[in-house]
C-alpha cells in the first residue's frame, strides 16, 4: 500500500517519478546528466515555469504504467473532458470528483486528480501519456 495519495491509497498502485518539476532543481538534474530544459506549464496547476521531464524517465514511467495496466487488467485510460469524467477529449488536469473516481472510474490517475494540494505530475501528464 502506498502512503502519498491520501484516500486513494486503498484503491491504487503508486508510482514515484524521481524528478521534480520545480526550477529550483534544475542544476541538480543537469549535474546528474538529465536531459531537461526550462519550459512552460500550461495546465493551470503548479508553477508556470518548470523543467521538462527527462525523456528516459518519461519512457520508463510510461512503460511501467502500461505494464502494470496489462498485468493488473487496468484499462490504459485517463480522466478527460471538462470535469475528468470522460475517457474522450483532452486530458483533464483538475481534481476529479472523489465519488466518481471510487465508483465509476477505471484507469490511470495522478496526484493532481485527487487533491488541489498536489500538482505533480499534471505538468508532465501530456508528455507521459499524450
Specify the residue positions occupied by each region the protein language model found.
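Active-site-adjacent loop/helix surface patches within enzyme catalytic domains
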Residues: 1-76
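Catalytic cores and adjacent binding grooves of peptidoglycan-active enzymes
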Residues: 7, 11, 52, 60-63, ...
